[in-house]
Amino acid sequence: MLRTIVVFAPIIAALAWVIFNIQKPAREQFNRDFLGKD
């Protein structure tokens, strides 16, 4: 169990960092396109 946490924690952290960095500009673009039409 502890070994699984040690193995997966950096992977999950890296995935979360990548997803966060992808979503931040995508969300700004989404707000500009979708909310801007109203």
From Swiss-Prot:
Bilayer topology term: Single-pass membrane protein
Superkingdom as given in the UniProt entry: Bacteria
Residues annotated as transmembrane: 4-22
InterPro entries tied to this protein: PSII_PsbY
Compartment(s) of residence: Cellular thylakoid membrane
CC per GO annotation: photosystem II; plasma membrane-derived thylakoid membrane
Molecular function terms from GO: manganese ion binding
Entry keyword set: Membrane, Photosynthesis, Photosystem II, Thylakoid, Transmembrane, Transmembrane helix
One matching Pfam family: PsbY
An individual GO BP term: photosynthesis
Assembly and oligomerization: PSII is composed of 1 copy each of membrane proteins PsbA, PsbB, PsbC, PsbD, PsbE, PsbF, PsbH, PsbI, PsbJ, PsbK, PsbL, PsbM, PsbT, PsbX, PsbY, Psb30/Ycf12, peripheral proteins PsbO, CyanoQ (PsbQ), PsbU, PsbV and a large number of cofactors. It forms dimeric complexes.
Task performed by this protein: Loosely associated component of the core of photosystem II (PSII), it is not always seen in crystals. PSII is a light-driven water plastoquinone oxidoreductase, using light energy to abstract electrons from H(2)O, generating a proton gradient subsequently used for ATP formation.
Protein family (similarity comment): Belongs to the PsbY family.
Name of the protein this chain belongs to: Photosystem II reaction center protein Y
